[in-house]
């Protein structure tokens, strides 16, 4: 499991764990990491198993529960027992799953545009099988990534600085093992996330 462990010059005494979304890597947290270490926080930013620089097992349990257990094991191996979790998009759902599974180890939970809090079925979006999502992932191109990011992340605007993130994702989508690694980008979970929020013991932002 690839990760960054960045320690501040003037430590505040707390550790923030940053959990990336489906179309992101730990590297995309660079501005957040800089702000947090300037404020005195130690920062751990992993690439989830199946994503970016981490290993991509062909046969694996790509669930939020498993990814949470992996990340918790990483943090424990670094001697860290209590954390602040910051999760974006898919990483938001992962952060919530971690906080619910290991409640005594999370002091605060920050969810940034997390998935799972909207009832898309009620909005008319049809359910899809995991294998259908996988086939959709396999059709990804540089052009489709750029168009998706421009429309979804940048509200239609675009600057050359954004291209680096498109190239990063394109290398992952089209790299070795692309025929099966798409499975890792379709993590699944059980239960109603909104109901789970009511049972979370930590402070949520």
Feature roles, as predicted:
Residues 139-199:
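Conserved alpha/beta-hydrolase catalytic His-Asp/Glu region
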Residues 4-7, 38, 45-90, 94, ...:
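Active-site loop/oxyanion-hole signature of alpha/beta-hydrolase fold enzymes
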Residues 28-30, 54-60, 120-123:
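Conserved catalytic-core motifs of eukaryotic protein kinase domains, centered on the activation segment
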Residues 201-205:
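Catalytic His-Asp charge-relay segment
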Residues 2-53:
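Conserved HGGG/HGGXW glycine-rich cap/lid loop of the alpha/beta-hydrolase fold
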Residues 28-31, 66-74, 93, 97, ...:
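Alpha-helical elements of Rossmann-like donor-binding domains used by nucleotide-donor carbohydrate transfer enzymes
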Residues 24, 50, 92, 116-117:
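Active-site micro-motifs of SAM-dependent methyltransferase domains
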Residues 96-101, 107-140:
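Flexible "cap/lid" loop of the alpha/beta hydrolase fold
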């Amino acid at each position: 499991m690839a990760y960054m462990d960045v320690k501040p010059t003037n430590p505040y005494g707390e550790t923030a764990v940053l959990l990336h979304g489906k179309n992101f890597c730990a590297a995309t947290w660079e501005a957040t990491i800089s702000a947090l270490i300037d404020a005195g926080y130690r920062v751990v930013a992993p690439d989830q198993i199946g994503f970016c620089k981490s290993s991509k097992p062909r046969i694996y349990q790509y669930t939020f529960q498993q990814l949470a257990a992996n990340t918790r094991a990483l943090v424990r191996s670094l001697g860290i027992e209590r954390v602040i979790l910051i999760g974006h998009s898919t990483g938001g759902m992962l952060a919530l799953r971690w906080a619910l599974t290991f409640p005594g180890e999370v002091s605060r939970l920050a969810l940034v545009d997390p998935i799972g809090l909207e009832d898309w079925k009620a909005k008319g979006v049809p359910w899809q099988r995991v294998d259908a999502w996988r086939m959709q992932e396999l059709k990804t191109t540089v052009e489709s990534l750029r168009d998706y990011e421009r429309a979804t992340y940048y509200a239609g605007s675009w600057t050359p600085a954004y291209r680096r993130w498109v190239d990063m994702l394109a290398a992952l989508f089209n790299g070795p093992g692309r025929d099966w690694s798409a499975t890792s980008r379709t993590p699944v979970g059980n239960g109603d996330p909104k109901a789970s929020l009511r049972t979370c013991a930590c402070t949520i932002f």
